[in-house]
């Protein structure tokens, strides 16, 4: 914990996320090949240089929801930062236990990142990347509904990830209750990733996912930063334009009644019907809606 405090004090850390699992390979943990453990990486992570670094699929500091929340509160007290969790979704017992333990308001996570099974990596067995963990929409909805039913959804910041860098997917995520979305592969594609699936070999041909200095020379920071920025600006523009089309100032104000899911060419159902939401779920509190509208107005967005 002393090392964690030192890192937090030495860098602009905004929050701490405890990774429980990853949508692309839930239940597998991780392995950083020794070829990618450079002197810099070894120093940062406190591991031997050039040696495979295996991260287990389970944490040693806790073994259930109760002990996890004790650990979350301990880290929050020691660092003064928001502490949350990231997880793929499968068996719902964990989430039921989490809600039950948070209802009292005594302990809880500050944010939850739901990572859909669509989450990407170039270093996972195909069976896991294709067929393990719920897709984002199903997994997120199942988690959010449990918090909404318990009346504590406003106490948690919900974050979505898993192919949400595409504007149509992001809009659905916001409507389902996500307060923000994480973007990974789309940013990587914007700076040159060709999905060669060599991330774990340290031989990424475009230099995007490698610690090999010779290969990394292929990345021009000036050019690539402009391309990444253009992607982010375009995504933001599209999200705001769709929001305007729905009559609201911000994508976070789009509701599950605003969106329909088409079933073939002959029928449709609202997002609320498809995911069994009650009216009013998925949107910020009234106070937050007022604050969001005011914030958008100060940045030149007229009220819808």
Located regions from the model:
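Active-site-facing alpha/beta catalytic cores
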Residues: 1-99
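Alpha/beta catalytic cores of nucleotide-metabolism and tRNA/nucleoside-modifying enzymes
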Residues: 131, 142-155, 165-304
């Amino acid at each position: 914990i002393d090392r964690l405090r030192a890192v937090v004090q030495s860098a602009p850390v905004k929050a701490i996320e405890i990774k429980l699992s990853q949508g692309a390979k839930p239940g597998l943990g991780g392995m950083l090949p020794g070829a990618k453990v450079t002197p810099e990486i070894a120093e940062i992570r406190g591991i031997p240089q050039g040696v495979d670094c295996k991260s287990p699929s389970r944490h040693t500091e806790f073994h259930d929801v109760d002990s996890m929340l004790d650990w979350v509160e301990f880290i929050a007290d020691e660092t003064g930062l928001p502490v949350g969790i990231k997880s793929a979704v499968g068996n719902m017992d964990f989430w039921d236990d989490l809600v039950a333990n948070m209802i009292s308001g005594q302990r809880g996570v500050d944010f939850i990142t739901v990572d859909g099974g669509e989450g990407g990596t170039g270093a996972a067995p195909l069976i896991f990347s294709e067929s393990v963990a719920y897709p984002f929409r199903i997994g997120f909805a199942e988690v959010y509904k449990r918090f909404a039913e318990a009346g504590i959804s406003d106490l948690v910041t919900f974050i979505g990830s898993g192919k949400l860098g595409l504007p149509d997917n992001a809009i659905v995520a916001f409507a389902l209750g996500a307060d923000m979305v994480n973007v990974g592969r789309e940013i990587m594609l914007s700076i040159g990733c060709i999905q060669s699936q060599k991330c774990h070999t340290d031989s990424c041909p475009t230099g995007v996912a490698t610690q090999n200095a010779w290969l990394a020379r292929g990345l021009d920071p000036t050019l690539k930063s402009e391309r990444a920025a253009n992607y982010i600006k375009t995504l933001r523009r599209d999200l705001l334009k769709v929001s305007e089309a729905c009559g609201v100032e911000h994508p976070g104000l789009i509701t599950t009644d605003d969106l329909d899911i088409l079933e073939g060419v002959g029928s449709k159902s609202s997002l609320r019907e498809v995911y069994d939401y009650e009216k009013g779920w998925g949107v910020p509190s009234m106070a937050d809606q007022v604050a969001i509208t005011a914030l958008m107005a100060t940045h030149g967005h007229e009220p819808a």
